[in-house]
Amino acid sequence: MGTRERILDTSLVLFNQEGTAAISALSIATALGISPGNLYYHFRGKEEILTALLAECDLALDRLHRRMDVELKGPMDFEPFLLSLLRVGHHFRCLFRDQEALRFAHPGLARSWSRLLKRIRQISQLLLKRLNQLSPLGLTPSQRDKLADSLMLSALASLCFELEPDKDGETQLIQSAHSLLVLLRPYLEAAGLNPVSNEQANAP
Amino acid sequence: MGTRERILDTSLVLFNQEGTAAISALSIATALGISPGNLYYHFRGKEEILTALLAECDLALDRLHRRMDVELKGPMDFEPFLLSLLRVGHHFRCLFRDQEALRFAHPGLARSWSRLLKRIRQISQLLLKRLNQLSPLGLTPSQRDKLADSLMLSALASLCFELEPDKDGETQLIQSAHSLLVLLRPYLEAAGLNPVSNEQANAP
Amino acid sequence: MGTRERILDTSLVLFNQEGTAAISALSIATALGISPGNLYYHFRGKEEILTALLAECDLALDRLHRRMDVELKGPMDFEPFLLSLLRVGHHFRCLFRDQEALRFAHPGLARSWSRLLKRIRQISQLLLKRLNQLSPLGLTPSQRDKLADSLMLSALASLCFELEPDKDGETQLIQSAHSLLVLLRPYLEAAGLNPVSNEQANAP
Amino acid sequence: MGTRERILDTSLVLFNQEGTAAISALSIATALGISPGNLYYHFRGKEEILTALLAECDLALDRLHRRMDVELKGPMDFEPFLLSLLRVGHHFRCLFRDQEALRFAHPGLARSWSRLLKRIRQISQLLLKRLNQLSPLGLTPSQRDKLADSLMLSALASLCFELEPDKDGETQLIQSAHSLLVLLRPYLEAAGLNPVSNEQANAP
DNA sequence: AATGAATGAGGGTTCATTCAT
DNA sequence: GATGAATGAACCCTCATTCAT
């Protein structure tokens, strides 16, 4: 694997582990066993690394976006898709968690970041559109977009705030997906479908 | 107003404006027109300021928490309450936005932070409990808690990610509250109540 | 003596000795026995030190400028005045020697530098004006200004290029002053005065 | 043209444009479209490039020096010769402008540099000797050498300090030559010759 | 001749924090 | 309560230079 790729991979791991602010360019180089000069030969600084990671994340989401029409055929497809989506987000979670810090430390990232956010919003809106095609949600388009935003925000927040820090990443992802599906539950039920495992409702 | 309070107020404003990472102890002192030594006389460092802000936020949420039983009497009470809640969150938004960066820069904040998060979770769960008391939601307690978590995450994310950066703070807050209500809409409707203004549903 | 003054003094000595490019902020701090942080507390960087030195030099020249009308009463006054002038230049010689390097490393100095150069030019022109008042030089004003420029350039160059590097600073200054007077010799002679010690002319 | 020559040419252009200190080995290689490794194959470093440029300049001045006896036949020959001399200096102006910075950054250049300076001094002295042969200057040899030094310094300074930065290079050269001739004017006049265009003298 | 990844020392700068006054 | 000079560690980055290919 080329040095450039190794830098990106290691950076992402370190950024996810300790936050982008806590990881210096030198610590990345040290973790890789390369000299700081070499790091700067491949990327002109931390900002360029982050730009590359943002682009990678954007690309991964773009691929998901393109596959939505094909993959979301029935109500059972939403949970796996949400999981794929959350998996991408989790893989690049540092980008979402440190969003605010990055905004001020690296104004140059603003455009990449807003492009990324726009794409997520599109995915969220398309998700509800597909759901509506399967069975009318009983919402105005405006309400549907609001619901899409809430869904997206809830998903983003599940990447940022770990409610069960003790559980491992995969379990957290599955729980996040379930929580998101609960938001959609009434609409899926209205479509005569309940994708979430049935439990006894209204226990005290 | 005492110097201690002025430090907290100014810090919060600066932290909200430019992020906690971008604001140094010196810049707080400069903004206040006091010497760095004086700042350190009142607070042993940036971490202590943040701890104090976390405590203030926690206190404000505690007050809201205690009033819920009294204030949430009918379905029309939920929107104002959500607004109050979001207003507190918005006032201390730097704490939520820089959560990740703070976690690593100041491990000493971890306990205060998890206490804060727990309280928000309690509020969210109590919110749905009250709703359930008004009219059964048709959810198991576990599903209800998941819904509560989604609601909370959506609220937290609306503090972290500005979807409409051009609008002013108050407008953003109202939109956030509406978005959250959309999440609850099916349950409120099931209770024979629709707190959100009626629009023509299912337009193409 | 205050730290600020000590920084300026030491910087000037080091800059003169080894050139502005060869002296780092750290080496100044080390030479003074202070920490780099303290250096940056007093000056935001090397550029601010240089700006302050340029201002000091400008001030010294301004003082000389103001005294010219009073001090240049007769032909015997020119040599001492030239020596004073050269002494100031020699004291700040790093500014003239590294002029080009500074121009590119610190564009912020451009304005201070051009102001300084303008003042030197004014002094040179006033010098010839006074000489002309003592005895007509037989030059058009335009020719007189050209002569003033040549005189100034010759003086500046004597600060930049050491023709006799083995001799000590004071001797070099005196020789420089003599060289400059030789340029003026024909005009002083025409005024019936020969301020330079008489030697036997036109030896083989 | 061989790579070696292209390196020298491009280096000289860049050094003249932005100063020797601001131009790194890498930037020269980039400007040439070659790899840094290739640059170091031809020259062991920036110092060797500068040594080569010093040698080129020295050679050009040597050629001028040898032609002086032949070319300086009459008083009208001095201006064109001065122009040729200044043109060489202007072509290699970075060497003179950054003299001080180079001295400390590259002590290895000291010998080449002092040889160069000595040659210029010889040329300046020979110039006055030829003038004296055309018509006695009325100066002792010592005074004549001092005048030669002043002339040389004035010429060097005109390469280092741009008094009229807005005018193009050729115009600056011509003005510099005129300024130098003004220094010689009294002696040329004394020889019954005025090489500078006559203007009305002693206007107020 | 030429490439380009890699090195490592060093420079400029920031900042949380201390302490004598 | 308050000042402000001082500290020192750490960070980001540049650059001359080397070397395997």
List where the protein language model places each region.
Chain A
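Amphipathic alpha-helical segments used for helix-helix packing
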Residues: 89-111, 125-129
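Hydrophobic alpha-helical connector segments
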Residues: 66-94
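Helix-turn-helix
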Residues: 6, 10, 14-52
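Short, basic, alpha-helical segments at the C-terminal edge of helix-turn-helix-like DNA-binding modules
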Residues: 55-61
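Secondary-structure edge/capping motif, primarily at the C-terminal ends of alpha-helices
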Residues: 65-68, 96-103, 131-132, 158-166
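C-terminal peripheral helix-coil segments that are non-catalytic and often amphipathic
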Residues: 126, 157-204
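Amphipathic alpha-helical packing segments from all-alpha helical-bundle domains
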Residues: 108-134, 145-156, 160, 175-182
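Short, Lys/Arg-enriched anionic-surface-contact patches
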Residues: 1-4
